[in-house]
């Protein structure tokens, strides 16, 4: 459990303007709220708008606890939605309003929850070999499903089950509407978060391997579903790590951001004349959400008491930023909304 007290005065000092262009997205009478806590590693937030008299709600994965959590906007309660979910990680909503999920565990697959609650397996292998551990997922307007497949979920028992990778590379896949699965990106180490630009002419992918592979790559999307023109848009090498992210209507990238354990150290005297190598962070940007414009320039930062793994725009006006962060789910109203 993480104790959190929201700021009692406006504007909230947790919302930082790094560039004047970010000022228009900050609501000066809005502050960061903690909506729920008690998770072990929060991931994969996905929002479902109000429908048929049911209030809007957000689901997120609590991976080590092998469950999905639910925040109900009507009751403002944070509860267990479903257990035994094969260590679900990333989630998204398709164009028909159905939940699509990345599973770890022994299943290592992409599944869709139908309106009647039944499960449909969409992909679990590529070229006859099991996927690694699908991580993050998005749906394009042509109904194709794009997802990343790093090895994090098979590295140990904490977020699934330890297993040997059957794939030669860690890929980004495109699952076409007709069910054909293609590896569209095969040359980056442990792809993680991914998203499209508002016009769907760009695909952004986080490379989240060991240093120095902590960055967001930008690709041009080709009409046939392939990509070209790989460009490094954002470089996060240092003490910070990017995980999941979302793109807003203006093309800004709102990135889950957090301390990754990369420290500089210095020798310091302690009792008895001994030397202790104490850590000194390489960067002041630690836990929260860092916002970049479409050119890769940092423009804003939202400080959180925990590392943010992933985020989602939701609410009736799609201007509530939900942030899945380690043990807790946080939210902040902003003058922006997610690109669809």
Segments the model singles out, each with a brief description of its role:
Residues 63, 67-111, 120-123:
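Blade-loop segments of beta-propeller domains
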Residues 2-31, 340:
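Blade/loop signatures of beta-propeller domains
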Residues 3-8, 103, 147-167, 256-283, ...:
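Short, conserved, GDST-rich strand-edge loop motifs in beta-rich repeat architectures
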Residues 31, 37-55, 84-103, 109, ...:
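Beta-rich, blade/repeat-based domains predominating
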Residues 211-215, 219-221, 226-230, 234-297:
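Loop/turn-rich, solvent-exposed surfaces of beta-rich toroidal or solenoidal domains
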Residues 67-69, 109-111, 171-173, 215-217, ...:
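A short loop-to-beta-strand structural motif that recurs across blades of beta-propeller domains
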Residues 72-76, 113-118, 175-179, 220-225, ...:
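Short loop/turn segments that connect beta-strands within beta-propeller blades
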């Amino acid at each position: 459990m993480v104790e959190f007290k929201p700021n009692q005065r406006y504007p909230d000092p947790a919302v930082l303007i790094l560039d004047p262009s970010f000022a228009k997205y900050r609501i000066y009478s809005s502050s960061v709220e903690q909506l729920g806590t008690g998770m072990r590693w929060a991931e994969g937030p996905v929002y479902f708008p109000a429908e048929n008299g049911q209030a809007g709600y957000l689901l997120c994965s609590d991976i080590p606890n092998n469950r999905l959590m639910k925040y109900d906007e009507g009751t403002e309660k944070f509860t267990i939605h479903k257990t035994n979910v094969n260590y679900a990680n990333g989630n998204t909503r398709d164009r028909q309003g159905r939940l699509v999920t990345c599973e770890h565990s022994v299943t290592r697959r992409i599944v869709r929850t139908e309106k009647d609650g039944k499960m449909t397996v969409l992909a679990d292998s590529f070229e006859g070999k099991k996927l690694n551990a699908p991580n993050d997922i998005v749906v394009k307007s042509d109904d194709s499903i794009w997802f990343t497949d790093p090895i994090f979920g098979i590295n140990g028992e904490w977020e699934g089950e330890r297993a040997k990778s059957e794939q030669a590379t860690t890929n980004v896949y495109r699952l076409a509407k007709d069910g054909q699965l293609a590896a569209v990106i095969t040359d980056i180490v442990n792809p993680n978060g991914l998203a499209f630009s508002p016009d769907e002419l760009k695909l952004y992918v986080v490379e989240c391997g060991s240093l120095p592979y902590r960055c967001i790559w930008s690709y041009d999307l080709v009409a046939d579903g392939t990509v070209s023109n790989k460009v490094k848009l954002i470089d996060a090498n240092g003490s910070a790590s990017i995980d999941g992210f979302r793109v807003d209507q203006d093309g800004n990238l709102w990135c889950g951001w957090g301390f990754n354990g990369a420290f500089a150290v210095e020798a310091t005297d302690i009792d008895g004349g001994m030397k202790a190598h104490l850590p000194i962070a390489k960067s002041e940007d630690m836990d929260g959400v860092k916002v970049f414009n479409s050119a890769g320039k940092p423009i804003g930062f939202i400080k959180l008491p925990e590392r943010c793994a992933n985020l989602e725009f939701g609410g009736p006006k799609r201007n509530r930023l939900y942030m899945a962060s380690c043990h807790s789910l946080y939210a902040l109203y902003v003058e922006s909304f997610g690109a669809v």
